[in-house]
Amino acid sequence: MPNLLLELRSEEIPARMQRKAAGDLKKLVTDALVEAGLSYEGAREYWTPRRLALDIHGLTARSADVREERKGPRTDANEKAIEGFLRGAGLSSVSEAQVVSDPKKGDFYVAVISKPGRATEEIVTDVMPGIIRDFPWPKSMRWGKASSKPGALRWVRPLQSIVCTFGPEHEETTVIPFEIDGITASNITYGHRFHAPEPITVRRFDDYAANLEKAKVILDAERRKDIILHDARDIAFANGLELVEDEGLLEEVSGLVEWPQVLMGSFEEDYLSIPSEIIRLTIKTNQKCFVTRPQGGETLSNKFILVSNIQASDGGKEIVHGNGKVVRARLSDALHFWKRDQGNLPDLETLTASAAKFGLDINKPLDQRMAKLDALDVTFHAKLGTQGARVARIRTLAKQLADITGADAALIDRAAVLAKADLRTEAVGEFPELQGLMGRKYAALQGEDASVAAALEDHYKPQGPSDRVPEDRVAITIALADKLDTLIGFWAIDEKPTGSKDPFALRRAALGVVRILLERKVRLPLLTTTRDIDLLSFFHDRLKVYLRDQGARHDLIDAVLTPDADDLLMVARRVEALTAFITSEDGKNLLAGTKRATQLLAAEEKKGTVIADGVSQALLKLDAEKELFAAISGASKDASDAVAGEDFRSAMEALSKLRGPVDRFFEDVLVNDEDAAIRANRLALLRLIREATGTVADFSKISG
């Protein structure tokens, strides 16, 4: 079977766009070929900083012939209908159509349209220019003399050449020379920009990849990542260190080089007085380098790992020297930020009003930054006021939550007023991702309680399903207050998530609240805090996602969750107890009996059958119905008492006693008795079954 090789070579593609672009190319090309009637065995995409490539193997040489029969009007139809049919079918006269007779419908015209298959080369020539012209780059550009013309080609960076070859695996291939904006596809590519700039003639993927590697280009991004990672580990180990691994940085760096060369640089040990998080971010963000640490250690070393795209004749000494100069300059800036943040602000006299408002100690650096944040009226959101106003709301909300979380009120208040103070530090101004973390470090430096310092970092957590949940009670309180304030505020101004759009990360905030409540066992009645049933429904959606991810069945969640259930921890405990019960033998049998009872009852209610208001013991004629009535009376009381005591397992055990009586009732008793009074009484007995099980869950929503 023939194979198709495609390469689009350009100036350097931003690393963050490469993987998705290669995937888009694969999907767009294969979808277009399949739509044109071709099939293929497999396809794989590749990318480097200067090229997107696609290898499609087992591609059919041509599309199949197509024969279509198109039914037309009756032969005695009006002339306009027949003319329209002929135009649509591409026929010039009715003589070119067939006449088919139908005993019921009469004679009518049928057009037989035969479409011969097309060669793959022709199809590729047709589809590729459109794919390239409409390629979904997040950002693109025009270039050259043609850039001012309407409809000029746009690409992420100037497109330089195209390779497109097609042919059998063991025979000579042919070039498919489609053209777009003056660039004609060929079998010529180029290797490394500096090491091998000469043209390379290729035939198919195997020699294409091999020739590129000879020309100092490793086509497979995963191989480049593997080389970088292993070489970085080895060079660190050889120096008595270990690599601080970073998957995101590894992905980015592998998209910056075609021929990775791993080197080690260093900086003065004096810079290690800077927090390791700042060092790591400085080196990562500005120079795309990895940091190292002593083997088995926690602190960083003064050695860093860099990845070059050039195999230098001096072994990389000049490259290391140049990178080292930049790293040292950046660390010097970081050290300056770190020291300035620990000092006094120059305009303290302008901050006294804000300091008084929040009870701040104007002699402490972090307090000064909070006062500055308030005094500058820094906007949180146009409709939700300033950061200072937000801190005041969080402070009030945290105070209300103190009794629920059991945290010290004074520590909560202190943590609340300092929670956003580090937003005015120079370190966070330079590296916003360090917010919270720097607050903790600066709080510790000025002697804050350990719980307060922890809360400044942890109140942002958890920031996703796998992030750590705060453990300290003060941190839990501030984290809840922060997230609840965000959700309440955006609900108040009707800025809710819609579809896939969630610009303010409200789903993440709600999931954070759910995780804190459940994983730290916090009993918080959400309606008393949010006072919004629609927001409570949003929490329910996040709770369902969380519980399903934990392995809970969706039907059991629905059976327990009522619209006004605002104690999410109790909902989770009910689901846990129901899951254990419903998977037991007693639970399965009771579920079957209960569903039979509720379905029969629902059918009679729908028909308008009379059902007694209550069960009359005088009308209980058979032993089975008497036994069931007695069992329900006892089980219902025991289950209700257990639920009131929040002992859901005991509630389930109480209901399990109904299994035998329910089974015997349906074996021995005819519900629809001829006597209307007895029938109404027995239906009332079924209603008692529904009400008894309803104390713990809506069994009608449980599948099985």
Curated annotation (Swiss-Prot):
It is an enzyme of class 6 (ligase). SUPFAM superfamilies: HD-domain/PDEase-like. Its main location: cytoplasm. It is found in: Cytoplasm. GO terms for molecular function: arginine-tRNA ligase activity; ATP binding; glycine-tRNA ligase activity. Disulfide bonds: none annotated. GO terms for cellular component: cytosol. GO terms for biological process: arginyl-tRNA aminoacylation; glycyl-tRNA aminoacylation. It catalyses: tRNA(Gly) + glycine + ATP = glycyl-tRNA(Gly) + AMP + diphosphate. InterPro entries: DALR_anticod-bd (IPR008909), Gly-tRNA-synth_bsu (IPR015944), Gly-tRNA-synth_heterodimer (IPR006194). Keywords: Aminoacyl-tRNA synthetase, ATP-binding, Cytoplasm, Ligase, Nucleotide-binding, Protein biosynthesis. Its EC number is 6.1.1.14. HAMAP family: Gly_tRNA_synth_beta. Belongs to the class-II aminoacyl-tRNA synthetase family. This is Glycine--tRNA ligase beta subunit. It comes from Rhizobium johnstonii (strain DSM 114642 / LMG 32736 / 3841). The lineage of its organism: Bacteria, Pseudomonadati, Pseudomonadota, Alphaproteobacteria, Hyphomicrobiales. The gene is glyS.
